[in-house]
Amino acid sequence: MTYCRKANQTSYPFILPDLPYAKESFKPHFTCETFDYHHGKHHNSYVQNLNNLLKDREELQKKDLEGIIKWSSKNSEVTVFNNASQIWNHTFFWYSIKPHGGGKPSGKVFEQISQDFGSFEQFCEQFKQEALGQFGSGWVWVVYNNNKLQIIKTSNADTPIVNLMKPILVCDVWEHAYYIDYRNKRSDYIDIFISHMINWKFVEDNLIQ
């Protein structure tokens, strides 16, 4: 099972995927400097690290990225897991946002949110509280699990796919995701993420596939 074809990569050596939009298009909510560091340096470093870790590991070179994540988690290969998972998580995040996104979804996503959280407003409040409650670095996810949507948070490089949960949306709450533009105001960043960034079409595609 592939959890997300856009976030997965099928073959070694792995690459830094291009952003699915121009980095300038997120002004004023994200500056180009944020993308230069977050995508060009942080994300890229995970790619380079993983390729170096696998250069003499032919058995792992045959796996796709999701396969490496699952294998390394099961076999306690922490360094391999951290870098592989961070590649996947970041790519999933880039698709979770888009210029002029956010606001209220429609269609199947809105119906599912209303059913599982009571209202879109209650969903937003719970999402924000989970994001603010993540101590230190991590991620806040919306997953489809046991036939319903859930909001969960993971620390550091952890990812829900190792627990057989289907991610449909993620917000990066590592400080490098927002510190250049928002400093220590994670709350402001989360508000902007919800109101101006979420790519609801990507969320819908993940929900129905």
Swiss-Prot record:
Question: What positions does the entry give for Mn(2+) binding?
Answer: 38, 90, 172, 176
Which top-rank group of organisms is this from? Bacteria
Q: Which residues cross the membrane?
A: none
Checking SUPFAM superfamilies in the record gives: Fe,Mn superoxide dismutase (SOD), C-terminal domain, Fe,Mn superoxide dismutase (SOD), N-terminal domain
Cofactor(s) needed, names only, are: Mn(2+); Fe(3+)
Q: Which GO terms describe its molecular function?
A: metal ion binding; superoxide dismutase activity
- Report the InterPro entries cross-referenced here: Mn/Fe_SOD, Mn/Fe_SOD_BS, Mn/Fe_SOD_C, Mn/Fe_SOD_N, Mn/Fe_SOD_N_sf, SOD_C_sf
- The answer to whether keyword Oxidoreductase applies is yes
EC number(s) recorded for this UniProt protein: 1.15.1.1
Q: What's the catalysed reaction?
A: 2 superoxide + 2 H(+) = H2O2 + O2
The cofactor note from the UniProt entry for this protein is: Binds 1 Mn(2+) or Fe(3+) ion per subunit.
UniProt keywords (A-Z) are:
Iron, Manganese, Metal-binding, Oxidoreductase
Q: Which residues bind Fe(3+)?
A: 38, 90, 172, 176
- Function field: Destroys superoxide anion radicals which are normally produced within the cells and which are toxic to biological systems. Catalyzes the dismutation of superoxide anion radicals into O2 and H2O2 by successive reduction and oxidation of the transition metal ion at the active site.
Q: Which family does it belong to?
A: Belongs to the iron/manganese superoxide dismutase family.
By its UniProt entry, which PANTHER family does this protein fall under? Answer: SUPEROXIDE DISMUTASE (PTHR42769), SUPEROXIDE DISMUTASE [FE] 2, CHLOROPLASTIC (PTHR42769:SF3)
* Protein name per Swiss-Prot or TrEMBL: Superoxide dismutase [Mn/Fe]
Organism, scientific name: Rickettsia typhi (strain ATCC VR-144 / Wilmington)
- Give the gene symbol: sodB
